């Protein structure tokens, strides 16, 4: 659909944004459904974030996505924030409703949906483990605590203080006392005895970290494991390849990427995203 005077705009606020796949995802969806909207990525330095958000309101943008380094800093400049976004302390989606801007975090739903589609109910109450303690891990840990009530949820990080901070921040959402913290050096038993293992670190991401893995001991995986890597480039990481060779069920990060985008797309357009067209576009290269 050609752009015209009624085209609605959506943008990505971040710095840098050149690597983002979000414009490809959403513009593919808009075209597939003849939605008169366009998605652009906008580099915004931290000191300009307030002005950028004010611009969304003044220019009547349909909404926006928010990425590094603004996911936390954007909360106080929005009119309303969902409970889940406030719980994890991060917003990745903004929706304009009249003159008000609402913030949400669709990373949580985006992470959970691929698990649910692969029989995730069997993970209810199971022991789990997450590699990483950054922003991605925060959404993952909150989602697992709220949806699966794991018997044990171990956060494995190279910086124990960061993992301890994450556990403390989410303690209010851990009524069963499931959260544990471990170093990589002490995590072997937790890896072996967890039903779900999630990589929420950049290890394995192309180009700079391709071939790296958070867990170089694949013999610790079995057919009882579900191994979920949030890395989406390449689509099959070393972690997933090695875990699958041991019989584990692999889930790649491309599914989460599309699902979190679909959750935002629905809020902006009140439509389901045409995911088959989006996957085709992402895999075209």
UniProtKB/Swiss-Prot annotation:
Keyword NADP: yes
One Pfam family recorded for the sequence: SDH_C
Gene Ontology molecular function terms on file: NADP binding; shikimate 3-dehydrogenase (NADP+) activity
Pathway recorded for this protein: Metabolic intermediate biosynthesis; chorismate biosynthesis; chorismate from D-erythrose 4-phosphate and phosphoenolpyruvate: step 4/7
This protein's GO CC annotations: cytosol
Catalytic reaction(s) noted: shikimate + NADP(+) = 3-dehydroshikimate + NADPH + H(+)
Signal peptide: none
Binding site for shikimate: 20-22, 67, 92, 107, 232
Keyword tags: Amino-acid biosynthesis, Aromatic amino acid biosynthesis, NADP, Oxidoreductase
GO biological process, one term: amino acid biosynthetic process
Active site, renumbered: 71 (proton acceptor)
Chain residues that bind NADP(+): 83, 132-136, 230, 253
Function: Involved in the biosynthesis of the chorismate, which leads to the biosynthesis of aromatic amino acids. Catalyzes the reversible NADPH linked reduction of 3-dehydroshikimate (DHSA) to yield shikimate (SA).
Family: Belongs to the shikimate dehydrogenase family.
Complex and partners: Homodimer.
Protein name, as recorded: Shikimate dehydrogenase (NADP(+))
